[in-house]
Each structure stands twice: as C-alpha cells, then as structure tokens.
C-alpha cells in the first residue's frame, strides 16, 4: 500500500491518479488526521508527502514523519514535501529568487539517483512554488540530484536512507516524463 500524506492541495489527487495507474493500492490521509503510530500500523510500502500551501512548519505531521520514519519506509516528497525533507534534516527553506507558478522549466541532473533513472539531462518539469531549499544550507546528509540552470535545487536525496524529494511536479502534464520518476520511486 502507498500512503499519500495530503497537505490540503488539489495536486494530491493528480498524484493519486498517476500513481494509481502504476499501483492502485493507495490510501490518502490529510496531514493532521494521522499519527506516527497510525502510519506504522498501516505498514505502507511507500510514503509520498504531497504538495501544499505554506511552508513545511505548517504541514501537519510531515516533518515528524520524515524525522522519525525515514529509516522505516521509503519517502518521496513533492514540492512542499521536498522542502519538508530539506528542513527536517537541517536545511533552510527560503523565498525563491523568482516565484514560479505554472511554468515548465528545464531540470538538469546533478548526481545519480534511483528515482531519476532513465531521465534525460535537461528534462522538462512543471514548477509551482515560491519557496526553495537553500543550497548553502543543505546538510551534509543530503545531496542535490537535479537543479535548474540557475542552480536552484530541483531534486535531492538522503545519502544513506531511502528519502527523495522533487521540487517540481512529476504528476503534472507539464512534466511529460513524470510517470518515470514515480515508477522509479515505487520500484524501490
């Protein structure tokens, strides 16, 4: 079973739809309607932390899920979920140099990552965000796996745990190869 933690965002159901085409065994629960014990009792195969408004501190249980469950379950953070991963491990989430809502942008590979396997360098991805993980504050345990031409972090991963984040939206029609990323994550 795949658990999607919903950060009160309409994109959650785009994720649900695309993931359901890969594996229909999905449960969606809002970020303030479950506990760590609930998640452990569910025993999900994967956890996906959805996009959402605001910043990681406003994302219900998400920071604690990352801090406490990162070694127990593979975790993928999308947009706000990605930012939560950066913050949970000690990075700073700051205002992006440019607010980007509904724009396709080129994303360049920066390091090998199992979730970016078979993705071409310079793939198109949908961006909807005004915050980013600050590159200068990235903790030693995380590495950048993709970035923009302006060096904004677009994907990261933990160096020893199965924890991955993408700032862009793989579930968007403006990310033509987004299904590949989700399929790669679900194969872990």
Where would I find each of the regions flagged by the language model?
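Short hydrophobic/Thr-rich beta-strand motif most characteristic of the beta2 strand and flanking loop
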Residues: 25-31
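Cysteine-nucleophile active-site neighborhood
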Residues: 44-113, 117, 182-184
């Amino acid at each position: 079973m795949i658990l999607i933690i919903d950060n009160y965002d309409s994109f959650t159901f785009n994720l649900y739809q695309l993931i359901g085409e890969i594996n229909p065994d999905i449960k969606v629960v809002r970020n303030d309607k479950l506990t760590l014990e609930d998640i452990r009792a569910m025993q999900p195969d994967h956890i996906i932390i959805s996009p959402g408004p605001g910043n990681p501190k406003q994302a219900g249980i998400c920071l604690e899920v990352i801090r406490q469950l990162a070694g127990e379950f593979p975790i993928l953070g999308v947009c706000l979920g990605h930012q939560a991963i950066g913050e949970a491990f000690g990075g700073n989430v700051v205002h992006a140099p440019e607010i980007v809502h509904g724009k396709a942008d080129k994303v360049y590979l920066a390091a090998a990552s199992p979730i970016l396997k078979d993705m071409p360098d310079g793939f198109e991805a949908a961006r909807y965000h005004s915050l980013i993980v600050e590159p200068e504050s990235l903790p030693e345990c995380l590495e950048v796996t993709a970035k923009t031409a302006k060096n904004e972090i677009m994907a990261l991963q933990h160096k020893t745990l199965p924890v991955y984040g993408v700032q862009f939206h793989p579930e968007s029609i403006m990310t033509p190869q987004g299904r590949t990323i989700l399929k790669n994550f679900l194969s872990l």
